[in-house]
Amino acid sequence: MLSRRDLFDARLQLICLDDAGTKDGHSEIDFVDAPSDLVPGVYEGGLKTWECSLDLVDCLHSIYGPDVANKIRGKRVIELGCGTAIPSIYLLHSIFSADPGQSAGDVIVHLQDYNELVLRLVTLPNVILAWYMSPASSAFRASAGTEAEQAEDAEPLPPADPTQPGELPITPGLKAAFLESLRTYRVDLKFFSGSWATLDVDKPGRGPYDILLTSETIYRTASLQSLVDLMRRATSGWARGGSLDEAASRLTLSDTDGLQRLADEPYLCLVAAKLVYFGVGGGVNDFTEAIERPKDGKRLGRVQTVLERNRGVKRSVMRVVWESL
């Protein structure tokens, strides 16, 4: 079970801020209180947790199993349109729950969202909660608990139990302990805001990425090509050698062993989405067509469904295998 910041708490923070910013004539509080979850080009719905991000966690667990922390050691991970970043939080919590003494290589985790506000209000707080609810924060919790008992005005720390609601004070001591854990567990964490077209994944220290994750990002056809281009550039360093058909043939739908074999692939590009986004225009078919049957006739890769949800709103997790460059 994972902890995340409540939207109400984020809203309260904005209300209490005297210098809440604006974007294109909209105040930051407007995004939280908006009746719509989407204001194209202004706010892309990242403050809320959507179903497909949970599907992506299920898929990652099926692929990597309980030893996920060790299996992603030495890898570069990026989550595009991360919002509350639940898939990345799952990976980070797994790392913080493992033995740091067995760390064989750094883990690079990059989180991107259109809105810098989203990164501040929910993404980073959720990352901190993933650490706080793990064994990695035990030393801090023990020392801070003793200090809180000695100081009358100190705020008590909540239990490290995701089933219980609570308020976590962000103190200088907590920030220092969190940063120290990043070093101890060898996690390189970075945040990026802005459109997909502005994210330069070719800069030193960024791509190519071994694991690319994105969920609920293919809902708008107008931005689909920009997303596909970024996904391909972000993993392009691995899309070399071997045939596309050979790579795609290593997995069949509903093949549990096949899902586990994905952990050994050179790169993993996973997209979680609803079959159709009513009222917006995008969906799985448009995404698949943009990759397999683009307008210029040059196939970019192949899209495979690796997980399906047929109850309620139909959803799926897709794996993208790119053509060799």
Protein language model features and the residues they cover:
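S-adenosylmethionine-dependent methyltransferases
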Residues: 1-325
